[in-house]
């Protein structure tokens, strides 16, 4: 049985398209290197994903007694969450909808083989 730990952040206020840009950079990296890469990224998604990766690492450490140095990011998924619909007033009494998109970020870390 492989050792895996999972962490999920639901309804994060960032569009899935923007979050996937950062998630693609981290997928498959060793856990320590992934956290380091996210720490120095300027993107908003990097901060959110870093928290989820750190949570998954802590879950592996505390729940399964895993060694942090052996962990790697096995799976990272960014799924679409519920969309908040807002209204913006426009000229001549019209209005347009603003879609404030949210994401569900799932990270699975496991022992590197």
From Swiss-Prot:
InterPro entries associated with the record: Ribosomal_uL22, Ribosomal_uL22_bac/chlpt-type, Ribosomal_uL22_bac/org-type, Ribosomal_uL22_CS, Ribosomal_uL22_sf
Keywords linked to the UniProt accession: Ribonucleoprotein, Ribosomal protein, RNA-binding, rRNA-binding
Heme as UniProt keyword: no
GO molecular function: rRNA binding; structural constituent of ribosome
BP GO annotations: translation
Function comment: This protein binds specifically to 23S rRNA; its binding is stimulated by other ribosomal proteins, e.g. L4, L17, and L20. It is important during the early stages of 50S assembly. It makes multiple contacts with different domains of the 23S rRNA in the assembled 50S subunit and ribosome.
The protein's name in its UniProt record: Large ribosomal subunit protein uL22
Organism: Stenotrophomonas maltophilia (strain K279a)
Gene name tied to this protein: rplV
């Amino acid at each position: 049985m492989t050792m895996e730990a999972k962490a999920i952040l639901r309804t994060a206020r960032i569009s899935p398209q923007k979050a996937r840009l950062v998630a693609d950079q981290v997928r498959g990296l060793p856990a320590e290197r992934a956290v380091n890469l996210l720490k120095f990224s300027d993107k908003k998604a990097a901060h959110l994903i870093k928290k989820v990766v750190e949570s998954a690492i802590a879950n592996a450490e505390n729940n399964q007694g895993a060694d942090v140095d052996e962990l790697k990011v096995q799976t990272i998924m960014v799924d679409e969450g519920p969309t908040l619909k807002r209204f913006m007033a426009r000229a001549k009494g019209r209005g347009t909808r603003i879609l404030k998109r949210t994401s569900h970020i799932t990270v699975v870390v496991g022992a590197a083989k």
